[in-house]
């Protein structure tokens, strides 16, 4: 199992959460409204998974959301367990992507 506190600390992310593909929160670190965030990211992952299957691009592994105020990187494993890291520092994007790839062995 992933140590979410360590993952947040090692990446410098402001917050993180673990949840299942149905958006049910398992754990969160430094995140207000964590249940709502888990539900929304879970829905995004599920929709992207279905789109990936529809266009025959293989299994979905990762979704990145970048906006003016920050970044969200969410990964899903083969058992539909999910981890998301959130940062307001866009310059950490490469570190977040690389660390999540390492954790999930993508």
Residue ranges and their predicted role:
Residues 1-15, 19-21, 25-106:
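Non-catalytic interaction/Regulatory regions outside core domains
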